[in-house]
């Protein structure tokens, strides 16, 4: 399993605070930059702070991207910025359920907790899947 490169905007701005045109620029500039680097446009969009707007949803759809939001995450909270605490909460939170999409940032504590998180999830019977699998499952459920 490799990594899917998605669109998370150019500057991580709070989209509800931006005009429609500014939201469009945030989203399209990122897709263009990703395409210039890897040769393909992102297929998924995740709004900063999970704050989608009607405009951001429409812009993402026009660009052929699916929304890929998260279920829960803790690595941005100071009490979980150490590997043991982060691994414990990520595996034992009440928000863990079938289809959960875990929010994990590129931080040292997250890197250091990753193996424990994966092991803990697998021990509970969960499997790691790529974003395409999640998107396909959501489409099937909506039908």
Task: Annotate each PLM feature.
Residues 109-143:
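C-terminal domain-boundary segment and adjacent tail
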Residues 13-41, 51-98, 110-116:
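Alpha-helical scaffold elements lining the catalytic groove of polysaccharide deacetylases
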Residues 4-7, 43-46, 66-70, 100-104, ...:
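Structural recognition of the beta-strand scaffold that forms the well-ordered cores
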Residues 1, 59, 119-120:
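Alpha-helical scaffold elements within enzyme catalytic domains, especially in hydrolases
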Residues 1-2, 13:
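Mid-chain, structured segments of secreted extracytoplasmic proteins
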Residues 10, 48-50, 72-74, 105-107, ...:
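Active-site beta-loop-alpha junctions enriched in small/polar residues
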């Amino acid at each position: 399993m490799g990594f899917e490169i998605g669109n998370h905007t150019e500057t991580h701005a709070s989209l509800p605070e931006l005009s429609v045109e500014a939201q469009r620029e945030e989203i399209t500039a990122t897709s263009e930059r990703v395409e210039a680097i890897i040769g393909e446009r992102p297929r998924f969009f995740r709004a900063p702070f999970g704050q989608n707007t009607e405009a951001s949803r429409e812009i993402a759809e026009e660009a052929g991207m699916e929304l890929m939001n998260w279920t829960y995450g803790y690595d941005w909270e100071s009490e979980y910025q150490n590997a043991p605490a982060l691994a414990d909460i990520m595996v034992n939170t009440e928000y863990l359920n079938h289809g959960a999409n875990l929010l994990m940032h590129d931080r040292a504590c997250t890197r250091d907790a990753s193996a424990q998180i994966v092991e803990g999830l697998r021990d509970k019977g969960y499997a790691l899947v790529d974003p395409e699998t999640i998107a396909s499952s959501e489409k099937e459920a909506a039908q």
